[in-house]
């Protein structure tokens, strides 16, 4: 992280050379928290209906006090709900009790130059939940579950956290997805519309084998009723994908709350490079019951390369499709309709 000097408007300061046991640090509007390099803050940080809040600095927030060594706890680590103008910059968030950085139903959020490292299952890195106008950049994320995740769902039974997700840009991040989960994930809980998201110029250095529903470098898992469309992935380098490269599915699973399923369409992948390791499989699958059919459609793959070799066909990509229409590889439609 780049060195950050103490802001003039700092309201809460944690000084270097000290360990602070804060329990739950609750912020209010216009708070600026400065964590000096060499300071360790032990606890969680929450903000509810706040405007203009910042956590900056080069110190550490440690969440290990909130969970047993090998299990999670029923709380988030850094959690902002219904907040406006949020800045998280420079500090390291390590070993939280569950999801690590969670902006929920927030507007105008910047997450910049952070290090996020989790160790326990459900230790998601960043969960952008029902938020709009969000930028995530220059971060290193090593997570034992989804690394960067988009959701729209009730949190702790609060229906107010179900809202559209739009205007999200994720760029210039380094991602290590450890078992389980996915590296860049939309889902599973997508209960409102998800649209106009951009993921670009990121490095996925590891996406480890999961052996369950996830395990993809880039995934969209629609288990609910929100419409997912106009999602762009550009200039992403994958150093290791042990299970899957792309995984796009509409499905029923244990996370489902809405039985009527939302569509997935107008998804764009451009210049995605697998640099080494085994050649991973990719999957696109829609949803079908005796009374409902939802097909994934209009998915575009351009300039996908494995170890420098361009994939010209769906066979080159090791792409499997089911209940999918209008899938394109380098501009050529590979299927109108496929049934198994």
Residue ranges and their predicted role:
Residues 1-340:
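Extracellular/periplasmic carbohydrate-active domains that bind, remodel
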């Amino acid at each position: 992280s780049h060195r950050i000097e103490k802001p003039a408007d700092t309201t809460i300061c944690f000084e270097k050379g000290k360990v602070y046991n804060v329990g739950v640090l609750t912020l209010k509007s216009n708070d600026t928290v400065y964590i000096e390099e060499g300071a360790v803050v032990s606890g969680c940080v929450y903000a509810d209906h706040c405007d203009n809040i910042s956590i900056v600095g080069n110190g550490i927030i440690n969440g290990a006090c909130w969970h047993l060594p090998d299990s999670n706890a029923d709380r988030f680590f850094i959690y902002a709900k219904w907040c406006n103008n949020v800045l998280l910059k420079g500090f390291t968030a390590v070993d939280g009790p569950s999801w690590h950085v969670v902006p929920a139903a927030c507007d105008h959020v910047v997450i910049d130059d952070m290090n996020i490292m989790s160790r326990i299952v459900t230790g998601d890195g960043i969960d952008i939940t029902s938020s709009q106008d969000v930028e995530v950049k220059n971060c290193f994320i090593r997570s034992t579950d989804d690394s960067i995740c988009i959701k729209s769902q009730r949190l702790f039974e609060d229906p107010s956290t179900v809202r559209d997700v739009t205007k999200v840009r994720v760029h210039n991040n380094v991602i290590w997805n450890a078992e389980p989960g996915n590296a860049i994930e939309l889902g599973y809980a997508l209960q409102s519309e998800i649209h106009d998201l951009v993921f670009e110029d990121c490095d996925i250095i590891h996406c480890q084998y999961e052996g369950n529903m996830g395990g993809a470098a880039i995934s969209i898992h629609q288990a609910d009723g929100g419409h997912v469309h106009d999602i762009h992935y550009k200039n992403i380098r994958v150093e290791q994908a042990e299970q899957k490269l792309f995984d796009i599915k509409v499905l029923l699973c244990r996370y489902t709350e809405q039985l009527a399923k939302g569509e997935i369409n107008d998804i764009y992948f451009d210049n995605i490079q697998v640099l080494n390791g085994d050649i991973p499989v990719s999957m696109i699958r829609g949803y079908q019951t005796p009374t409902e059919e939802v097909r994934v459609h209009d998915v575009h793959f351009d300039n996908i390369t494995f170890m420098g070799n361009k994939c010209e066909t769906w066979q080159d990509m090791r792409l499997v499709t089911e209940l999918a229409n209008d899938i394109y590889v380098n501009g050529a439609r590979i299927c109108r309709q496929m049934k198994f």
